[in-house]
Amino acid sequence: MPVKVHGVILMNIEEWEEYRYVEAGIKESITLIEDPGLKKMVEHVCHSGGKRIRPIILLLVSEICSGSYSRSLNAALAVEMMHSASLIHDDLLDQGLVRRNLPSAPEKFGPSGALLCGDYLIAKSIAFISPYGEKVIQDFGKAGMDMAEGEVLDLKLEDESFGENDYFKCIYKKTASLFAISASIGAYTGGAEEELAERFSHFGNALGTAYQIVDDILEFLEVVEGKESKFTSETLPHIYMKSTSKEEALKKSIDCVKLHVAAAKETLETFRECPARDKLFQITDYITVDMLENL
């Protein structure tokens, strides 16, 4: 169904071929799980309404680089499995109760079950990424380590010295790093050389950063739907509020989103014009500025 934010219906990404391709791959991988209890947990986590943005980015980039979806699908599934595992661990750390309008994995299956489900998804992501060669595997592993380091940085949010520079380092590792490798690995699976893959990585980094700041803004304004946690991360508007008014902090945060969106689009403009590139432009707006339209 279409995603609705503040009463406004955004584009229906579920109608996209890339979305259906990823969904079919996830469904097939779940059918291969032998243990019924583990299968139930993975189904709950992986079929809870995610937009599949990261694997879709990977597939679209591979198409821009003249690759094929069949060649790139396992890499896309690896990215989605890693992302799903990170959400479980995030809910464990934040004592998340609700995610995407459903009970979180720890709430539904207990901390031990959720932890094991996350472990399985990480192992499955490694299995999916393993055929793609040394460079791709190294980059994928580095992103996983970055995400863990980002969570460690996030634990320091109660430290009064946690400022803007710490925040951007944290969200690069927690969020933007996976966007960056989704784009760069898509380039590699499409046959691109390292220089082109690096440019796609810059696009993913800028988009992932903008996406996280938008998420922070919505949380700051208490308009996030379908998510509930006992603890929350530090947000950019809250950091700015330490030295300015709420209104100015919000404006500075929105300006920061626009800056990173512009950087992402500027990089996109350098790639060959094609329907896949057009979709990346749509995604860029869809998960950033479109979410802020009615604030």
UniProtKB/Swiss-Prot annotation:
Thermal properties of activity per the entry: Optimum temperature is 40 degrees Celsius.
GO terms under biological process: isoprenoid biosynthetic process
SUPFAM superfamilies: Terpenoid synthases
Organism of derivation: Methanosarcina mazei (strain ATCC BAA-159 / DSM 3647 / Goe1 / Go1 / JCM 11833 / OCM 88) (Methanosarcina frisia)
Residues reported to bind Mg(2+) 1: D90, D94
Subunit structure: Homodimer.
Residues involved in isopentenyl diphosphate binding: K51, R54, H83, R100
Origin: domain of life: Archaea
Keyword Flavoprotein found: no
One MF annotation (Gene Ontology) recorded for this entry: prenyltransferase activity
pH dependence text: Optimum pH is 7.
Keyword set includes Metal-binding: yes
Function: Involved in biosynthesis of the polyprenyl side-chain of methanophenazine, an electron carrier utilized for methanogenesis. Catalyzes the condensation of isopentenyl pyrophosphate with the allylic pyrophosphates to yield geranylfarnesyl diphosphate (GFPP). It prefers geranylgeranyl diphosphate (GGPP) and farnesyl diphosphate (FPP) as allylic substrate.
Lineage per the UniProt record: Archaea, Methanobacteriati, Methanobacteriota, Stenosarchaea group, Methanomicrobia
Cofactor note: Binds 2 Mg(2+) ions per subunit.
Top-tier EC class: transferase
Family statement: Belongs to the FPP/GGPP synthase family.
Matching InterPro entries: GFPP_synthase-like, Isoprenoid_synthase_dom_sf, Polyprenyl_synt
Protein name in UniProt: Geranylfarnesyl diphosphate synthase
Catalytic activity: isopentenyl diphosphate + (2E,6E,10E)-geranylgeranyl diphosphate = (2E,6E,10E,14E)-geranylfarnesyl diphosphate + diphosphate
